[in-house]
A protein has these predicted regions:
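Polytopic transmembrane helical bundles with strong interfacial aromatic enrichment
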Residues: 1-332
Length: 332
């Protein structure tokens, strides 16, 4: 299990770096740095580094190759240790690592399709969402291997109410991240609003671009307000809720607050477009923290249901039927 844990952490770090670099590719307009050539760049695996957009795009592809190797290694090690508790079988690290490998291969193929389509906004957003899926599956493997609070979630107790609230946070987070990717790629959307917190429309861009940024902002605010409510609920019910879930909620809320600060500074200080990569990096942190919150809350709720059922069965009473809401969506 220790080897799986180490490789999952390494894969998670590489995935985060790859996603941040992908944001730099989009923001710098380097997505077509190799033209419509894929997987090679103008017929070369190692082309002459004569242009900056080519360097950025090729570096992004190299990072993708490293990520594939890291995830494949994680799968192989998990398969070798599949007999250990928590690795093989339902809810084990092996299944989630296989999901991560499938997602990363799909992301690689979709990246090639995106290049062939000339980096169309819809294809870029689809690629971005698949990349978020890769991150989620690697995070699932990391948690199942005992890191990021995975071990504590099996021994602490919590409610399905907290799990449902965490699911909503994760859903809002992925929607906000998707709209963030569209805002960065759609012509004029990134500069559609010139003021904060309200949107002072930029007269030089089309209304659709402004609407995209307004929707992105609205989702971000809804996520922040929801996480405030989640933290308040968990603090009020701290005697019956898992500390690891409260800690994860605090981290997610802190990431959202940081993101709102970064976004406001970008607009008010008229920061250069390259600094939008920091905004995207924080967005990745938001998705990772919200997904971890949802998965940990689900894991805690399921462990609590199992413990209650075992206690009732030991006393000879009827075993309560588990509710569907407490079943983790990522366990397979």
């Amino acid at each position: 299990m220790r080897a799986v844990r180490r490789l999952s952490i390494a894969a998670l770090v590489v995935a985060c770096l790859h996603l941040v670099f992908g944001a730099i590719v989009r923001i710098s307009g380097s997505g077509m740095g190799c033209g419509d050539n894929w997987p090679k760049c103008y017929g070369y695996w190692f082309p002459p580094f004569s242009r900056m957009d080519l360097v950025v795009e090729v570096s992004h592809r190299y990072l993708a190759s490293i990520l594939v190797i890291a995830v494949a290694s994680m799968v192989l090690v998990a398969f070798r240790h599949r007999a250990e508790p928590g690795v093989g079988g339902r809810g084990g690290a092996l299944r989630s690592s296989l999901g991560a490998l499938g997602a990363v291969l799909l992301a690689a193929v979709l990246g090639g399709v995106t290049v062939k389509l000339g980096n169309a906004p819809w294809a870029t957003v689809a690629h971005w969402l698949v990349a978020m899926t890769v991150l989620a599956m690697i995070a699932t493997t990391t948690i199942r291997s005992g890191t990021l609070g995975g071990t504590a979630a099996l021994v602490q107790r919590g409610s399905s109410r907290a799990a449902r609230a965490a699911y909503v946070a994760a859903a809002l987070a992925i929607l906000a991240v998707a709209l963030g990717g569209l805002t960065a790629k759609f012509p004029g959307a990134a500069v559609g609003c010139t003021t904060v917190p309200l949107c002072g429309p930029n007269p030089s861009v089309v209304p659709s671009s402004i609407h995209i940024q307004i929707t992105h902002r609205t989702l971000a605010v809804l996520l922040a307000l929801h996480l405030v409510g989640v933290v308040m609920m968990l603090r009020k019910r701290r005697s019956t809720e898992a500390p690891i879930v409260l800690r994860a909620a605090w981290i997610a809320l802190a990431m959202v607050i940081l993101q709102l600060g970064v976004a406001s500074a970008m607009i008010l200080l008229h920061m250069r477009p390259v600094y939008r990569s920091l905004h995207e990096a924080t967005g990745i942190g938001i998705w990772l923290s919200c997904f971890a919150l949802a998965y940990l809350a689900s894991r805690v709720a399921r462990a609590s249901e199992t413990a209650v059922a075992a206690t009732v069965a030991a006393r000879g009473g009827p075993v309560p039927v588990q509710r569907a809401a407490t079943t983790p969506v990522t366990d397979s």
